[in-house]
Curated annotation (Swiss-Prot):
Species for this entry: Actinobacillus pleuropneumoniae serotype 5b (strain L20)
PTM field: Methylated by PrmB.
Cited function: One of the primary rRNA binding proteins, it binds directly near the 3'-end of the 23S rRNA, where it nucleates assembly of the 50S subunit.
Subunit record text: Part of the 50S ribosomal subunit. Forms a cluster with proteins L14 and L19.
Keywords: Methylation, Ribonucleoprotein, Ribosomal protein, RNA-binding, rRNA-binding
GO biological process terms, semicolon-separated: translation
PROSITE patterns registered for this protein in UniProt: RIBOSOMAL_L3
Gene: rplC
MF annotations from Gene Ontology: rRNA binding; structural constituent of ribosome
Name recorded for this polypeptide: Large ribosomal subunit protein uL3
Similarity field: Belongs to the universal ribosomal protein uL3 family.
NCBIfam families, alphabetized: L3_bact (TIGR03625)
InterPro entries: Ribosomal_uL3, Ribosomal_uL3_bac/org-type, Ribosomal_uL3_CS, Transl_B-barrel_sf
Length: 208
C-alpha cells in the first residue's frame, strides 16, 4: 500500500470513552493527485508521482506547468513519489485520507526543525565538565577528541559541534487514533517531526 502527503497542523488531545487523555498530532491530508505513473517497462521500476495542495500560477515554472497539464491536474505545492506493488493507478486519480481507515499504525516522515549550529551538549547530549575545581573555561567543551601521535588525526564521524536539525526524520509505528475523511484529517498518537504547516509523508507502518 502506498502512502500520502499531508501537512502537520499541530498537536492537541482527544479523550477515550474512559476519560483517558491521548496526545495526538493532527495531519491534514488533502486529496493526493496522481501526476505520473511509472512502469517497469518505461522507467525500470513501478511507482506513482503525486502532488497535493495548490500553488500560485506565477510560482509555477514552465516545465512544471507542462507536467501538470499533461496529467490533467491542478498545480500542487510539490511532487512526491511512492513505489507501487501491483496496485493500479491512473493519471489524474485522487487518493484520499480514507485509505487509512483500516490501518492501525503508520510511519511519518518529515523534516525536523532546524536548530542552527549547536554544541556537543545540546547536539549529542554530552556531559558537561566540572563547574568549579579549577575549571574556568571548559564547562561545555567536548574534552578529548582523539588519541596521540598515532593515529595523529580525528576519526571521521566523531561527534562534535555542528549543524543540528533540518534533516529528514522518520518516526515509526505511530498509532492511528482517528480518520476524519470529511474534514480530511488524520490523528496519530504522539509527536511527528517538523514545524507546524510543514509537509509530512504518511505510510502504513513497516513494523506493524
Amino acid at each position: 500500500m502506498i502512502g500520502l502527503v499531508g501537512r502537520k497542523v499541530g498537536m492537541t488531545r482527544v479523550f477515550t470513552e474512559d476519560g483517558v487523555s491521548i496526545p495526538v498530532t493532527v495531519i491534514e491530508i488533502e486529496a493526493n493527485r496522481v501526476t505520473q505513473v511509472k512502469t517497469l517497462e518505461n522507467d525500470g521500476y513501478s511507482a506513482i508521482q503525486v502532488t497535493t495542495g495548490s500553488k500560485k500560477a506565477n510560482r509555477v515554472t514552465k516545465p512544471e506547468a507542462g507536467h501538470f497539464v499533461k496529467a490533467g491536474v491542478e498545480a500542487g505545492r510539490g511532487l512526491w513519489e511512492f513505489r507501487t506493488e501491483g496496485e493500479e493507478f491512473t493519471l489524474g486519480q485522487e487518493i484520499n485520507v480514507d485509505i487509512f481507515t483500516d490501518v492501525k499504525k503508520v510511519d511519518v516522515t518529515g523534516t525536523s526543525k532546524g536548530k542552527g549550529f549547536q554544541g556537543g551538549v545540546k547536539r549529542w547530549n554530552f556531559r558537561t565538565q566540572d563547574a568549579t575545581h579549577g575549571n574556568s573555561l571548559s564547562h561545555r567543551v567536548l574534552g578529548s577528541i582523539g588519541q596521540n601521535q598515532t593515529p595523529g588525526r580525528v576519526f571521521k564521524g566523531k561527534k562534535m559541534a555542528g549543524h543540528l536539525g533540518a534533516e529528514r526524520v522518520t518516526v515509526q509505528s505511530l498509532e492511528v487514533v482517528r480518520v476524519d475523511a470529511e474534514r480530511k484529517l488524520l490523528l496519530v498518537k504522539g509527536a511527528v517531526p517538523g514545524a507546524t504547516n510543514s509537509d509530512v509523508i504518511v505510510k502504513p507502518a513497516v513494523k506493524a
